[in-house]
């Protein structure tokens, strides 16, 4: 079956196919993720809009049984600030890859599309890209079938405590129940508190967000633990972010 649709879409990636052709993965609002064939991509009028992290309204020909094609486009958004900063671009690429990993091809998920688009728009607007990534990570866990409660103790259900997290129980422990897991995470209590807040944040109303570097580092470390334990994916874009910690500071110093 072949259908023509017009849909908002975000280019996730492209890869070479044959000598001068490309396969382009686009996350569309209407039909989810699809792979598109672009012939003679280097000379094609589509060349400017098949780069990663380009958002546009595409006219698409969807073929359920063969190659799909991009017929036209308009209303292009290229996120110039993201693309001009290696660090922001690395995190933007990672959240796009997470969305890709969380969704089957040809599966519509308009709320996820809107969430990813808004995340990129807030990064482009200059909000803290590391914190936005943490929020995206914690909220998208449900797409991987993971639901975590950072609001109450798993034993007594009290709220507003200095919680720690237990992988043994997959939940939080209050101080009176720390003893239930000798291998609890020994987190800064601010980490479960922030993650509980992050789960409820609506990006449509978010105007500013700021955290101290030490807290952001602790969040990053714990999010890595959560993803390793519960999701188990190892994305190239995440490995690149990890490498930034080793040599990224040198680049920042050279810019001064």
Curated annotation (Swiss-Prot):
Free-text function comment from the UniProt entry: Involved in DNA repair and RecF pathway recombination.
Organism: Streptococcus pneumoniae serotype 19F (strain G54)
Protein name: DNA repair protein RecO
UniProt cross-references to PANTHER family, sorted A to Z: DNA REPAIR PROTEIN RECO
Keyword Methyltransferase: no
Encoding gene (name): recO
Matching InterPro entries: ARFGAP/RecO, DNA_rep/recomb_RecO_N, NA-bd_OB-fold, RecO, RecO_C
Family: Belongs to the RecO family.
Keywords: DNA damage, DNA recombination, DNA repair
Cellular component per GO, a single term: bacterial nucleoid
GO biological process, one term: DNA recombination
HAMAP family: RecO (MF_00201)
